[in-house]
């Protein structure tokens, strides 16, 4: 569904990602892992058209996206939940959802909003509340909901669990699994390696902007040395399966 071919991208003369190739199949939950500064967020921003592609190509549903405006990617069905959520904190929950659905006819707003509220009932209870007054977990729910308002086929999620309490992490990961079961294709960037491996079908690991591993999550769990070398962690999921 999404394919990167020898992608290199960066910021002016600085190259953040080097010669990266991978493909995300329709309906999959694909995890992109790596230490801070590995190029994960730059990859997501290149897919969305917010970072310069210096070499290589990006395809979505066999259509080349390289060089096309960010709005085109939204219209084609790609949405992003950015790191740090980036909500309009002075607007209400409802108003943030309206912003998320700006590319669709207003007539579809109510149906899309109910779909979001079904996934996150807590947002329905707080739909008139100012986004900046929500808890961190509720704000992450709203960030996901805002992305879903455009009825995407493909969802990019950058650092789902960052700064969240364990209970909220559980709720947000369960929401991703629900979306996957409903047919949404997901690319997840996540620092919580064990949780990412538990839900992902396939995993890529980046280090210094380069691909160092690609395989199924099951295979990755068997490679403890991989996580110690590139992520500096002992992965509980790996340890428990050995």
Language model region names:
Residues 147-148:
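ABC ATPase C-loop
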Residues 12, 52, 68, 93-111, ...:
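ABC-type ATPase nucleotide-binding domains, specifically the catalytic core motifs of the NBD
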Residues 130-134, 138:
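Conserved ABC ATPase signature
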Residues 52, 64-85, 89, 109-113, ...:
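ABC ATPase NBD coupling module
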Residues 48:
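Helix-to-loop junction immediately C-terminal to a conserved catalytic motif
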């Amino acid at each position: 569904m999404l394919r990167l071919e020898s992608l290199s991208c960066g910021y002016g003369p600085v190259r953040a990602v080097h010669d990266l190739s991978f493909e995300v199949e329709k309906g999959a939950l694909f995890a992109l892992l790596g230490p801070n500064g590995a190029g994960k967020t730059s990859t997501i921003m290149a897919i969305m058209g917010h970072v310069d592609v210096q070499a290589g190509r990006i395809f979505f549903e066999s259509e080349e996206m390289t060089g096309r405006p960010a709005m085109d990617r939204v219209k084609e069905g790609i949405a992003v939940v950015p790191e740090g959520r980036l909500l309009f904190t002075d607007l209400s929950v409802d108003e943030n959802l309206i912003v998320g659905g700006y590319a669709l006819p207003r007539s579809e707003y109510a149906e899309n909003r109910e779909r979001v509220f079904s996934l996150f009932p807590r947002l329905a209870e707080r739909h008139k509340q100012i986004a900046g007054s929500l808890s961190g977990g509720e704000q992450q729910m709203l960030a996901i909901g805002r992305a879903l308002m455009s009825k995407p086929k493909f969802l990019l999620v950058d650092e789902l669990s960052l700064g969240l309490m364990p209970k909220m992490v559980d709720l947000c990961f369960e929401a991703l699994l629900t979306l996957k079961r409903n047919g949404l294709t997901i690319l997840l960037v996540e620092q919580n390696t064990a949780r990412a491996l538990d839900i992902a079908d396939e995993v890529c690991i980046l280090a210094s902007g380069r691909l160092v591993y690609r395989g199924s999550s099951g295979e990755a769990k068997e490679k403890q040395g991989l996580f110690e070398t590139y992520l500096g962690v002992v992965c509980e999921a790996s340890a428990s399966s050995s």
